[in-house]
Amino acid sequence: MDNTYYQLPLELWVKIVDYTDEIYLLLTNKSFFELLYLVNVKMDTIKYVVENNLSDVLKHIVELKNINHPIFDKDIITLESLNKYLKKSCKYGLIEIVKYLIILGANIKERDNIAVGKACENGHLEMVKYLVSQGADITVDNNYSIMKASSNGHFEMVQYLINEGADITA
């Protein structure tokens, strides 16, 4: 696939992707992906990457951020999208995805630490431990996290939250 990229001018690749209005082609090759800032696809890139559990693509996005790639000059990767899919990734226990979203700037404390609450509610103990290590507050919103963990029968989670300072009487 690497050779295919160089067989056509960039302008033609941009036209092909714009015509199909899908980013799937851009995910087949790192060189293709870097064209994302040139196309007019109306798709939420982070949504697609997270919903398909493409942690390698997120890793590449982090690499692009580290070199100040033009992909970050346009609103292709937005804080709103990062925060939204951080919450969803916590809900489904996608810890590798969560790590990359945080590196990209997702806010674990957004909306009263809802991300850690979703992880507690769904029993993802390793996720909760990671979020706490990154500064998530398990006591906000009247100890929402322990309330959700206990109401869903995640007793090991409840024990961990108590050890971390959650208030069972709240």
UniProtKB/Swiss-Prot annotation:
Pfam families: Ank_2. It comes from the Viruses. InterPro entries: Ankyrin_rpt, Ankyrin_rpt-contain_sf. The keyword Endoplasmic reticulum does not apply. SUPFAM superfamilies: Ankyrin repeat. ANK repeats lie at residues 41-69, 81-110, 111-140, 142-170. Signal peptide: none annotated. SMART domains: ANK. Keywords: ANK repeat, Repeat. PROSITE patterns: ANK_REP_REGION, ANK_REPEAT. This is Putative ankyrin repeat protein R846. It comes from Acanthamoeba polyphaga mimivirus. The lineage of its organism: Viruses, Varidnaviria, Bamfordvirae, Nucleocytoviricota, Megaviricetes.
